[in-house]
């Protein structure tokens, strides 16, 4: 069970979890540590101005998109995105175990009560110390996070099995050894904390203080607290919401947001998730067994390499001694090469042993932790963490299956010495390759008839030469950054076809492929030049739009079912080049003021475009228009829209500007400057307006000529 200890320690304080709570990202943290890493945000970032709460966050943040990309937008334009809504950037520190920790928002309260129950500063933000995802707390503060009763039970059992000394639960820094436990408060104290937080006077004088060992026994014998609903603290969980994947109480079903969701019996889902976790553990257990056998094989390889090295050196010395008069100078050079090869092989094998040992220890720890979790009889507590554990188990199992259990180095020295040449040819004496049975694979051939580009995606296909007899274990596809920069790996695997998304529009990329096996890698294929689409073709995105938006015409036409303004985004984001699209007004009743422009992916969807700091827009009625960003209105311009009007939006990253047009005439000055980052086309409207999107358009001639003059 020693490997499991990593699963039981808080990433902030490095000690065993004390009163752990579950963050929305499924990671755990001590209640006291959660309070210490709270950060108070400015009023402009308050929950009223952002779609975030203690139990919910917005989908993405454009800063996180750039930071979490496989490669930055400036470098290549393709990558993998994801993350919580970020809090404002805050200087970070390093905790003892190397995770990111924000500075305390305020001094910890000096009270004998649980720190998480004290008041939380208004507009507080907390960042997960493991995945660095952030969210803003609602009025409930830390009480909005469920407590991990299952983890508490596992820690109690682990500490009992280790007979570990009980620590004080209120020490601000390194916890000292506890000297007493209050049976009423259920808290362990050291002497200084007891005198400061639990003085023997007033109501506390009636509390019973017992030795820590006796307190541990009484705590173990007392029934464990049942997990309660975070929204209704007096109610126990009674059902499981299938849509939200969380236990809920009966009040949530009758009054809360789960009233229209599908629910199932708590006990049935508890058994189902236990069964799923057990099945996942079976597969991971097999991988762990294979890993142990693989480590034995690697350790044997070290001995074999040592023996083969000695044998090879002896053979080399014997051959050199026969030609000693002519080979003295050459012998030293050859021995140096053998030693270098020897050290290289050992280094590769030892590095792989170290890597596999760490991975196996982590896998074993996860397995032991999961087995302990399965022993728990708290259905709601188990269901709070089961989905995350199942995903972790599957992910760990997949990681073992990606060529991890294959030696990276052979034990043989693929060298031999040819001593047949005459003495006058000694200066040409060198090692020759003898292991012709294991050559590298042949160079792959790109199948040009199957390679193509569509919009900002590229599909490439390749194959081995028809007469090749050496099998390839996999392929490595490389692309440059679209600006003639260095090549970077974008795919490694056994497939012979790959589609790369997220490239820049109107850009030229170079692609090449090579094959590999245990012996090494092949030569690169011929370089293929790929040209992405000059203009962007896209539609509106139903997945990110407000639920009141109504789509038609293959998602090119939108209107709304509400009298309030609702936001819809385009499916394609831009960060480079010049892009132009138009929207025609199909219906315009009662003089509303729709807004057109660009926005980040996490823009607010239930207010007019431009009300928050994630959108840059022009809103217009039948007489005039305004530019708006972060609820700031500028540049009132005469001239409005009617049914049949055309609104043009021009996003120019070369000049870092955003410009608007109405009926082919520029509306006002340049709307916004210094435009940088990842932007999505955006519209806000109500039920009185219907618009149709037109894409794949060239930049207007009058703008191009004006730009060339400038």
Swiss-Prot record:
Official protein name in the record: E3 ubiquitin-protein ligase TRIM9
Binding site for Zn(2+) 2: 229, 232, 252, 258
GO biological process, one term: protein ubiquitination
Catalytic reactions on record: S-ubiquitinyl-[E2 ubiquitin-conjugating enzyme]-L-cysteine + [acceptor protein]-L-lysine = [E2 ubiquitin-conjugating enzyme]-L-cysteine + N(6)-ubiquitinyl-[acceptor protein]-L-lysine
Amino acids binding Zn(2+) 1: 168, 171, 193, 198
Species this chain originates from: Bos taurus
Pathway: Protein modification; protein ubiquitination
Complex formation: Interacts with SNAP25.
Modified residues (Phosphoserine): 44, 46, 49, 53
SUPFAM superfamilies attached to this UniProt entry: B-box zinc-binding domain (SSF57845), Concanavalin A-like lectins/glucanases (SSF49899), Fibronectin type III (SSF49265), RING/U-box (SSF57850)
Primary location: cytoplasm
Any one GO MF annotation of this record: zinc ion binding
Zinc finger feature spans (RING-type): 10-50
């Amino acid at each position: 069970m020693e490997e499991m200890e990593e699963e039981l320690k808080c990433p902030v304080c490095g000690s065993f979890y004390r009163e752990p709570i579950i963050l929305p990202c499924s990671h755990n943290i001590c209640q006291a540590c959660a309070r210490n890493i709270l950060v108070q945000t400015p009023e402009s970032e308050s929950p009223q101005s952002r779609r975030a709460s203690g139990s919910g966050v917005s989908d993405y943040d454009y800063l996180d998109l750039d930071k979490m990309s496989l490669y930055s937008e400036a470098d290549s334009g393709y990558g993998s995105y994801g993350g919580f809504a970020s809090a404002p950037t805050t200087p970070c520190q390093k905790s003892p175990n190397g995770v990111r920790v924000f500075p305390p928002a305020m001094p910890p309260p000096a009270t004998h009560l649980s720190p998480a129950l004290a008041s939380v500063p208004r507009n507080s933000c907390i960042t997960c110390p493991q995945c660095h995802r952030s969210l803003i707390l609602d009025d409930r503060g830390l009480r909005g996070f469920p407590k991990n009763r299952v983890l508490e039970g596992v820690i109690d059992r682990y500490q009992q099995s280790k007979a570990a000394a009980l620590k004080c639960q209120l020490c601000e820094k390194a916890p000292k050894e506890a000297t007493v436990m209050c049976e009423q408060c259920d808290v362990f104290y050291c002497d200084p904390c007891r005198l400061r937080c639990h003085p023997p006077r007033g109501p506390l004088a009636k509390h019973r203080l017992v030795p820590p060992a006796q307190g541990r026994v009484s705590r173990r014998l007392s029934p464990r607290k049942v997990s309660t609903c975070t929204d209704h603290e007096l109610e126990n969980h009674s059902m499981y919401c299938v849509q939200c994947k969380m236990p809920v109480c009966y009040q949530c079903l009758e009054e809360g947001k789960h009233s229209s969701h599908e629910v199932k019996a708590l006990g049935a889902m508890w058994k189902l998730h236990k069964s799923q976790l057990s099945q996942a553990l079976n597969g991971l257990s097999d991988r762990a067994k294979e890993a142990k056998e693989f480590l034995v094989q690697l350790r044997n390889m070290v001995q074999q390499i040592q023996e083969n090295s000695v044998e090879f050196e002896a053979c080399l010395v014997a051959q050199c001694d026969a030609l000693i008069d002519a080979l003295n100078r050459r012998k030293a050079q050859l021995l140096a090469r053998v030693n270098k090869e020897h050290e290289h092989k050992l280094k590769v094998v030892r590095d792989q042993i170290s890597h596999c040992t760490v991975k196996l220890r982590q896998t074993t720890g996860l397995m032991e932790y999961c087995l302990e979790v399965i022993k728990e009889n708290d259905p709601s507590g188990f269901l709070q963490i089961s989905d995350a554990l199942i995903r972790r188990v599957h992910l760990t199992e997949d990681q073992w299956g990606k060529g991890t259990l294959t030696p990276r180095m052979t034990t043989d020295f693929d060298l031999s010495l040819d001593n047949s040449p005459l003495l006058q040819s000694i200066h040409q004496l060198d090692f020759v390759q003898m292991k012709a049975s294991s050559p590298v694979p042949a160079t792959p051939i790109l199948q040009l008839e199957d390679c193509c580009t569509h919009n900002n995606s590229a599909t490439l296909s390749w194959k081995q030469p028809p007469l090749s007899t050496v099998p390839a274990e996999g392929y490595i596809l490389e692309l440059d950054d679209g600006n003639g920069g260095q090549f970077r790996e974008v795919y490694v695997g056994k497939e012979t076809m790959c589609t790369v998304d997220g490239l820049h529009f109107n850009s030229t990329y170079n692609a090449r492929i090579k094959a590999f096996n245990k012996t090494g890698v092949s030569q690169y294929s011929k370089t293929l030049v790929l040209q992405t689409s000059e203009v962007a073709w896209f539609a509106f995105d139903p997945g990110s739009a407000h639920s009141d938006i109504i789509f038609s015409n293959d998602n090119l036409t939108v209107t709304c079912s509400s009298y309030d303004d609702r936001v819809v985004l385009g499916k394609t984001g831009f960060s480079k080049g010049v892009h132009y699209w138009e929207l025609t007004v199909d219906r315009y009743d009662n003089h509303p003021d729709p807004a057109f422009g660009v926005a980040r992916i996490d823009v607010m969807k239930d207010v007019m475009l431009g009300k928050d700091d994630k959108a840059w827009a022009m809103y217009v009625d039948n007489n005039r228009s305004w530019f708006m960003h972060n609820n700031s209105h500028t540049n009132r311009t005469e001239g409005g829209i009617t049914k049949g009007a055309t609104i043009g939006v021009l996003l120019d990253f070369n000049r870092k500007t955003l410009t608007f047009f109405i009926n082919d005439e520029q509306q006002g000055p340049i709307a916004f400057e210094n435009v940088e980052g990842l932007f999505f086309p955006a519209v806000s409207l109500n039920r009185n307006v219907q618009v149709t999107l037109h894409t794949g358009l060239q930049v207007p001639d009058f703008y191009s000529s004006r730009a060339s003059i400038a």
